[in-house]
Amino acid sequence: MLSWAITFLIIAIVAAVLGFGGIAGTATGIAKILFVVFLVMFIASFFFGRRGRG
């Protein structure tokens, strides 16, 4: 699950770079939302994944 969160976080960062660069101006808002959502998912996966192994 952690690998999925990292994958989607990278996708959100790429979308943000493209959106902020002016290539897709309307994608800026979507990229911001995706970045926050997947950052939260990454942090949650990191902590819950570590707790399950102990």
From Swiss-Prot:
Regions annotated as coiled coil: none
Primary localization: membrane
Keywords associated with the record: Cell membrane, Membrane, Transmembrane, Transmembrane helix
GO cellular component terms, semicolon-separated: plasma membrane
Compartment list: Cell membrane
Membrane topology category: Multi-pass membrane protein
Transmembrane segments annotated in the record for this chain: 4-24, 29-49
Family recorded in the similarity comment: Belongs to the UPF0391 family.
The protein's name: UPF0391 membrane protein PFLU_0090
